[in-house]
A protein has these predicted regions:
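Residue-level signal for beta-strand positions within conserved beta-sheet cores that form or flank
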Residues: 51, 91, 170
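Alpha-helical cap/lid subdomain in secreted, periplasmic
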Residues: 71, 78, 82, 86-88, ...
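Structural recognition of the beta-strand scaffold that forms the well-ordered cores
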Residues: 54-59, 63, 93-99, 130-136, ...
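Basic, gly/Ser/Thr/Pro-rich low-complexity segments located predominantly at protein N termini
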Residues: 15, 64, 104-106, 142
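Short connector loops at secondary-structure junctions
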Residues: 89-107
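N-terminal secretory targeting modules
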Residues: 1-58, 63-71, 88
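Generic, well-ordered alpha-helical scaffold segments in large soluble proteins
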Residues: 61, 83, 98-101, 166
């Protein structure tokens, strides 16, 4: 367990809290139900097989599961994992979801440690990772003042470059996703859209 108590408020999965010792045969009818996770920082699966690997995803609420159904496990990484297993018969790769709702890459604010600072721990520090998906940046743009959009674009690109460099140094394959459209959001302006397009143009050029 982690040194400090932790929680995942956006787990979209029910936890059952009871006093005393419980097991799979316990009656949970009187348990307190909350749609959060607590305490556990991570789970490793030990195996004697040597052909297993993982795909680690760093992202924000889009990856964390904002808008999905509680207990349905229908976040896009869940669906991706299911498609790999069922449709493509790839059963030796796991998908690790390291998304944090309201997380940001470089612009201070939001929830959790900035992606550029948690990348080593949350992505490179995971066991068995062979592929990395970077899908984050929209919150940085949305929380940038219009006059600072060029600076945010530059800092995002620099952070992406650094993440990619670190992954390639470990011989990991990297997929960098473009930033999704956000027209209609309260922070949408011409300047924010121009910033998104600039960053996406750079991503597509790589």
């Amino acid at each position: 367990s982690p040194a400090k108590p932790t929680m995942h408020p956006g787990s979209r999965t029910t936890s059952y809290i009871m006093k005393g010792v419980t097991n799979a045969h316990s009656n949970f009818e009187k348990a307190q139900r909350v749609n959060h996770w607590y305490t556990i920082a991570g789970i490793d699966v030990y195996t004697m097989k040597n052909n297993l690997s993982a795909i680690a995803i760093i992202g924000n609420s889009i990856t964390d599961g904002r808008g999905t159904t509680d207990n349905a496990q229908n976040r896009w990484p869940d669906i991706m994992s299911e498609m790999l297993h069922l449709k493509h018969k790839i059963t030796n790769q796991g998908v690790l979801n390291l998304g944090i709702g309201s997380n940001q890459v470089v612009v201070p604010g939001g929830i959790g440690t900035l992606a550029k600072d948690r990348y080593d721990r949350d992505i490179l520090g995971q066991c068995g990772v062979k592929k990395v998906i970077i899908f984050e940046g929209v919150n940085d743009i949305g929380n940038t003042k219009s006059g600072n959009s060029e600076t945010t674009a530059r800092l995002l690109i620099e952070s992406y470059q650094n993440m990619i460099k670190k992954a390639k140094a470990r011989k990991l394959k990297v997929y960098l996703a473009t930033i999704t459209p956000f027209k209609g959001a309260g922070y949408y302006t011409y300047f924010h859209e121009a910033c998104r397009q600039y960053v996406n143009d750079w991503i597509r050029s790589q």
